[in-house]
Each structure stands twice: as C-alpha cells, then as structure tokens.
Amino acid sequence: MDPRLLSAYNEELTYLRETAREFGEEHEDVAGRLGLKTPTDPDPYVERLLEGVAFLGARVKLKLQDQFPDFTQHLLNAIQPHYLAPTPSMCIVGFEPQEGDPAVIEGYKVPRLTELEAIAADQDGATVTFRTGHDVTLWPLKIVEAEYLGSRAAVAPYAAVANVRAEAGLRLRFAATGGASLSQLDPPSLPIYLAGSEAIPGELYRQIAGETLAVIARSADSASGAEGWIKLPAPEQHGFEQDCALLPTELRSFRGYRLLSEYFACPERFLFIRLMELGRAFAASPEACDVVLLFSRSTPVLPGAVFPSNFRLFAAPAINLFEKQLGRVPLNRYDHEHLVMPDRMRPLDFEVYRILEVTAFSESNTHPRPVAPLYAFGALLYDWREALFYVPRLRHRRLSTKEQRLRRRTDYLGTETWISLTAPGEATRLDDVHELAVRALVTNRELPELLRFSGDDGLPA
C-alpha cells in the first residue's frame, strides 16, 4: 500500500472535522440533526461516515497527484520529445581497410547509419547493435610518423615556407598500404579521430581546431627547398554537422540540446578533425607525404607525448539505437493501457526509445489502419470522426520476482513503454481493433556494458 495514503487520510479527516465544526456553528439546527454540533462527543455513525469519506478523498487526492507526471510527460512528448527518452550507449568504432583490395584505391564508402553487431558476454548470444554516425571512406592509407614540434626553433624552417610566425607545429607522415602508390589516392577530406588518454586528445584538438596558422605538405623524400611545399586549407572540426547527429533530430527541439546530450554521454565523439585537399599533396608524393600544421602557441603537455596511435583514421562514433519492428501488441478491452514489448523471447534485451509508427489490425488481420500520435503536431489535420490515436507513456521498470531473488546482471533498470488508444469521435470504433503493429527506435538496455573489448587499440565507449 502506498505509504502516502495514511498522511492524505489524516489530512482529509482533519479538514472534514474542522469544516463540520464551522458548519455546525453557523447552522445549529441542521448540525444538531447531523450530529456535528458537538465534535468532542460526535455521533459514532457520523464519525464512521466522515472516516469513510476521508478515505475516499485521500485515494482521489493521491490519484490526482499521480496524474501530474503523466500530464507533464505528455506535454514534454509534444514539445521536447527527447527530454524523457533514455540515453543510449555511445562509443567510437574503427574500420580497417583490407590490404590489396582494389575497391579502396578509389575510396570505399561506409555510409552513415551502417549497423554493426557485437555479442554480449555471458548472455546466451545476445546481440548488441550499433549504428554509425558519420560516413567513413576507406583508403589504403596510414600514418606512420607523428611528431610534435614544441619550440619556435623546431618549426622555423616550416614557418619560413608558410610565411607565418609559429610557436609550435605537428608533423604527420602519410604512407600508402597494400602496395598502392600514394599518388593514386585523392581524398577530398580525411577525418581523423584524436585518440589517447588523459589530456593529450583535448590539447591536440584545441591546437588543431583553434590555433592553426597554416598547413603545408610535400613529399617525404623530396630534396627540393621551399618550392616543393604545397599550402593546404586549414583543418575543420568534424561531428557538429546536422548530418552527423547520433541522437534523432527534431525540428521542434533546440539543436544545442542534442549536442549537449551527446557531449555529456560521450565527449570523445567530438574529437574529430578533417584535413582538407590532401589529394593535391599526395599527387606529388609516390611513397610518403609529410603534412605539417603550424600553431600560434606551444603547449608543454604535448612534446614527447604524441605518437601515430593518437591519430586514428577511418573511425566514427556509433550509438546503440536502431529501428525495429516490434512484436504485435494484443489489445484487451478491459485494459486501457497495453505494454509495448519489443521482443517477447528476450524482453530485457531491448528498451523502446521512441515509437515511430503504429498500425491497427482487426481480428481477421485485414484492413490495417494507421494510428496517429494524439499529442503531436499535425493531429488536428486528421478527421477525428474516423481517425485512431495513440498515447504513449513511460514507466520505470519494476524488478521481477526472479530478479528480486537472484542477482541482476547490472544495476540499470530502464523503462517500459505503455500505449493506450483513443477514438475521439466514437469510442466503439476501438472494438474492431484486435492488435497493434509498432515500429520504434530501440536500444539494448544495459547490454553494451557487458561487451568485452580486447586489444591495445580499443576505442572508448
């Protein structure tokens, strides 16, 4: 029983007794017949009546209080649908081009939203699905050397070529792999993920994105002087674009909130920069090419701490959020809400992030009818005499009896999604609806926590 019920009952009973006393003072004749005139020695029948009314009033009061979160939930779902949604797991994934594959010579594109699957440890083969957030183009290319030039003297020869006053610099040496020639490659832009631990990636990002004065490049085996250098455009930040979003975007939502949500969930997803027009430098570099970035200031953290492993090619952020056709939702006319279960065989392996589409079916499974969200923009465009609408509601998942007795796999509980139908024009139209087909964005709940990462080059999750 709700522990708040006793407090609400006492409040209601006190209120009834006080108002009864005031009523008895103003209307003595009526109060005398009701037994309210002497509250210190009340009529036992009237007292039982007051206690019963107080009990019913307390239950109604608690019900109204419990409805307020539902009201705010429906309101937020209409104006800011991502506020209440669970936060999916995010990580950085890396791709490796297959050496000798002729397809990568021209650049093999791995499109955004490509699904990647992994197996959760000790979970009977449960699959965890991630989707990439960036386009990744694979080239037979690698960074073989990385050197941070931390003094004005070290960058003086390069600064003279670029005609800038630089205090520090970064030299990256690119080489082709798989027997390919560097001059065969023509990447219009090359995204690089700044990997590493502690402050190294952040300092590199700050210098490359905010303190670059010039970018120059030439063949690593070039014996020419200043004539062999090529000036390249400044590097660009990568990952803030709308077409690089991990979380679903909404026109009615503030774009900055999406960026903040992604940053606090996985700050590494923004540690991407792009080098531009490297094909011009590669054209004159059959074996290897040196690219030098010149900075306006030096930082004491980076000298001696920068290695090729800090610059990951062919990486992209990924999110455990994907579309899924859920199992049919059977309707019971005696229940006003129905549980949306993504997979009845593995109910705890999925969590609904957002409902995308609902279709109603009759008992004969014919004449499917679309069901629109009630509290959403555009709902008024439907004919309310014919249309069906649904209202989703999130609830915190409760522990099952088995979970209460045995150990849970993690501390995360997550949420459950319930759905209710309404027909504003005529409620009897719901009698023909036998079940619902639901398509939604889902996550794998806490299964990403159970993934095992092996190797020395594991990327953050």
What are these regions (language model features)?
Residues L138-K142, G239-C244, P460:
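Short, surface-exposed linear segments at secondary-structure transitions and domain or protein termini
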Residues V93, E106-K109, T114, P300-F322, ...:
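Surface-exposed flexible segments
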Residues Q98-G100, A121-D122, S197, F295-P300, ...:
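Short, flexible beta-strand-to-coil junctions
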Residues E11-E12, E18, E22-E28, E47, ...:
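Glutamate identity and glutamate-enriched acidic tracts
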Residues E147-Y148, R173, G179-R398:
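Short, low-complexity Pro/Thr/Gly
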Residues H27, H74, H82, H134, ...:
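Histidine (H) residue identity feature
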Residues S362-A461:
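C-terminal domain/tail detector
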Residues M1-S222, W229-L232:
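Extended assembly-interface regions of large multimeric machines
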